[in-house]
């Protein structure tokens, strides 16, 4: 039951353990883009993050959407852009933004969706919302080898199968500064039920 799971999660947090999250079904696709009729001629083609393919399942005709988590850019050679063996993931890409306030010590950064594949979370931090430069932060599951300037974030499961992101304290990992703007991209999926797709459009 949900109550039992939340009790287990609470105990796991006490020992610094995060249970395994849902895992998105994955596949790989290859395709080309013919730029012969495109003017002016592009030097490269970029596939933007988000939904890139759809498919019907082999059982019951269930449909699914597949996404990429990051932009992918390839060069155009002889009018052809080749996307080769791109990893795609079943589910929906969601973006959530937060603004850090050092006047709110109880502030929490909770991702509001369940069904998140935690291996596919992307976290970036800017000095402020209007800044143009984004620094990528990496997931860390322990405190070993961390310095005061390590660009890392930590993760813990909270109620209703959701996840909370938190950052360093200035000793173990870099501490956020007031008005830092946090962007989190993540994927919610159907887990194992996303398997069985083989043809994509």
Model-derived segments and spans:
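Signature of Asx- and small-polar-rich beta-strand/turn repeats characteristic
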Residues: 1-201
